[in-house]
Amino acid sequence: MPLTLGQSLFANFLGNSPRWYKFAILSFLAINPILFYLNPFIAGWVLVIQFIFTLAMALKCYPLQPGGLLAIEAVIIGMTSPTQVLHEIQANLEVLLLLVFMVAGIYFMKQLLLYAFTKMLTKVRSKIVVSMLFCIASAFLSAFLDALTVIAVIITVAVGFYSIYHKVASGKDFSSDHDHTSEAPEQLNESELESFRGFLRNLLMHAGVGTALGGVCTMVGEPQNLIIAAQANWQFGEFAIRMSPVTVPVFFAGILTCFIVEKFKWFGYGAKLPEAVHKILSEYDAYEDARRTPKDKVKLIVQALVGVWLIVGLAFHLASVGLIGLSVIILNTAFNGITDEHALGKAFEEALPFTALLAVFFAVVGVIIDQQLFAPVIQWALSYEGNVQLVIFYIANGLLSMVSDNVFVGTVYINEVKAALLNGQITRDQFDLLAVAINTGTNLPSVATPNGQAAFLFLLTSALAPLIRLSYGRMVMMALPYTIVLSIVGILAIESGFLTDMTQYFYDSHLINHHTAAEAAGKALGGH
C-alpha cells in the first residue's frame, strides 16, 4: 500500500534513523517553546542536555540535522539571537578556519604520514611499544599542531591501513580499485577483521588521549589555550613554563596508563595485530618501497619540508592557524603538481560537515551565554580562596568541559576571572594561578567524552568510526582509565601546593616575572 504524504514526510525526516529517535527529536522541538515560556533558565539547560543527546547518538544520525533543528528553534523562540550566534562564530573564526584549511592541508601530507606510521607499525612488533609510540607522537605533534589536525592525521593513517588490508583480504592486489566500506563476509576472515578493528580502536584512542596530553602544554596546542594566553599576556615560553607543574606529571601519568591498560588488557585495550594483517601491511610497505619513483621521493621530501614550515609557523605563531593551513595546501599542491579542482575538492570532504556542526554548536553556546547558565557555578567558585579556589575551578571546568565545548568553557571562565581581577576580588598572582587551573581543567578531564574534546568528536563522526565499530559508549569506556588518572594527577598537582610552590620557584629563578592588574586592564575583555 502506498504511503500517504504524512507518512512519506515522517519516513524522509532524519532518513534512516530509528523511529524512536525521530519521535524523540520531534518531542524535544514540541516541549522546548513551552519550557522556555515557563522557565528560561531550566529550558536552557534542557536544550544543552538535548544537544548532548544528539551528539551521543552520532552513529544513529549525524548530529548536524537534529542539533541544527534544535538550534534553529532556539533562535526563533528567543533563547538566543542571530546576532549572538554570529558573534560566537566571529569569536571562534580561527577554529573554523583551522577546520576548513588545516585538516585539508594535512590531507596533502597523507603520503608522508602514512609512510612514517607504516614504518612504525611494521618495524615495531610489540603492541605496548607501538601504543606508547602513537601516544607520545600524538602528544608531541599536538604541542605544535591543533589536536584536530593530529587526529585527522591518525584517521588518515588508520583508513590507509584498513583499506590496504580490506583490499587484499577481498582477493585484490595493491593496485586495484576497491571500496573498503563494503562488507564481504565470504572472503574476509571475520575474527581476523575483528582483531584488526580492535587494534585500530586501541591506537586511535591512545593517539586521541596523546593529543590532550600534548595539547594542554603550549599556547598553540588547543584553541582555548590561545584565548587564555591572550587574556593573561603570556608568550609561548611563559605559557609552557607556567603550565609545567601540572602538565609534566600528567604527561608521565598518561604514558604510564597507556602501558598499564595495554599490559593488562583492561577497558578494551590489548588487542593484538593479527599475524596475517601484519604480513599484508609489511608486504604493502615493501611493494611501495620497490615502486617508489624519483618523483614520489621528491613528493615525500616536499611534504616533509612543508611539515617543518607547519611546526615552525605554529610554534612562533607567524600567522593564524587557519592561514598556515591554507599555506600548507598551496605549497603541497603547487610543488607536487595537484592542480585539478576535483582532486582539491576531496581534501575538504572530511572536515566540512564537522565545521557546519561546530557552527550549530555556537548557537547552543549563544543560549548558554544569553540565559547565563554558568553564572551560579562561577559565583560559587569565587567564594572560596587560595588552593581550594584553584581546585574548585579545575573541577568546575573539568565537569563542564566533559559535556560542553572546552573552547567555550575556557573562554567563559577566563573572562569571568578577568572581571573578578579588574573588580579587585582577586590578586594578579592568583589570577595567573587560576588561568593555569582553567587551562588544565578544560583540557584534561574533558577526555571523558567526545563532547569535551573536539578531536574525539571529530573521530566519532568520521567515516572511520563505523568501519572499526567505535561507538560513543565504547569511546567513553576506553577513555575512562585516562579520565580518572589525568583528572586525579591534575587535582593532586594543584591541591598539594606543588603548582604554587613551583610557580614561586620560577619567579625566584627569574624564569617568569610577576604581571600587574593594570597590564590585564590594558587588554580589553575579548572573546565572549
Swiss-Prot record:
The chain crosses the membrane at residues 23-45, 66-86, 95-115, 130-164, 203-223, 241-261, 310-330, 349-369, 390-410, 448-468, 475-495. GO terms for cellular component: plasma membrane. The keyword Transport applies. Keywords: Antiport, Cell inner membrane, Cell membrane, Ion transport, Membrane, Sodium, Sodium transport, Transmembrane, Transmembrane helix, Transport. Signal peptide: none annotated. Belongs to the NhaB Na(+)/H(+) (TC 2.A.34) antiporter family. It is a multi-pass membrane protein. InterPro entries: Na+/H+_antiporter_NhaB. Its main location: membrane. It catalyses: 2 Na(+)(in) + 3 H(+)(out) = 2 Na(+)(out) + 3 H(+)(in). It comes from Shewanella amazonensis (strain ATCC BAA-1098 / SB2B). The keyword Ion transport applies. Na(+)/H(+) antiporter that extrudes sodium in exchange for external protons. It comes from the Bacteria. It is found in: Cell inner membrane. This is Na(+)/H(+) antiporter NhaB. GO terms for molecular function: sodium:proton antiporter activity.
